[in-house]
């Protein structure tokens, strides 16, 4: 998954089999691709017209636009996606409307217990590593036993690029 691919130009440089993470917010009554607030960005619907890649990770930056995003995903036939970094009230709202393509965060601060409470209602877990990698053999098995798909945040996004090889070796020994 390529991080923060918020323009059609960047999208065209991504191999078709790869997925992308995008930042979506509302701006002047439009859905746009933009990480930062108060700035304009490319039109989300126009971006979808060009999308024929792998999994799309939807990082919603303006809460309560999720249902409009879902309408556009359906319109353009995008089926491989999930919501990332949503607030818990929004997660519950999405679940109550039947949406399961949601990732709950698992980190040293957000425990596996909440994930397991909602495991039949969500498809993904997003593993973040603010200060350390939280996954171990036991919780990995718990997640996999519940058929939850896993997405690992790359350590450099939390200023831990120096630990990438360490984490890679650790994870390879977990399976």
Could you describe each region identified by the protein language model?
Residues 1-175:
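Phosphate-group recognition and catalysis centered on beta-loop-alpha active-site segments
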């Amino acid at each position: 998954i390529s991080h923060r691919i918020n323009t059609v130009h960047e999208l065209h440089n991504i191999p078709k089999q790869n997925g992308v993470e995008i930042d979506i917010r509302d701006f002047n009554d439009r859905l746009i691709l933009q990480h930062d607030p108060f700035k304009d960005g490319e039109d989300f619907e126009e971006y979808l017209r060009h999308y024929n890649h792998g999994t799309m990770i939807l990082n919603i930056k303006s809460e309560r636009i999720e249902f409009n995003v879902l309408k556009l995903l359906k319109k353009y036939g995008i089926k491989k996606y999930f919501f990332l970094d949503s607030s818990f009230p929004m997660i519950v709202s999405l679940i109550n409307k039947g949406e399961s393509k949601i990732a709950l965060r698992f980190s040293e601060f957000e425990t596996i217990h909440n994930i397991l409470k909602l495991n039949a209602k969500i498809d993904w877990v997003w593993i973040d590593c603010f200060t350390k990698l939280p996954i171990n053999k036991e919780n990995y098995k718990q997640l996999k036993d519940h058929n939850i798909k896993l997405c690992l945040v790359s350590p450099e996004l939390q200023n831990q690029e120096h630990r990438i090889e360490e984490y890679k070796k650790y994870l390879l020994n977990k399976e």
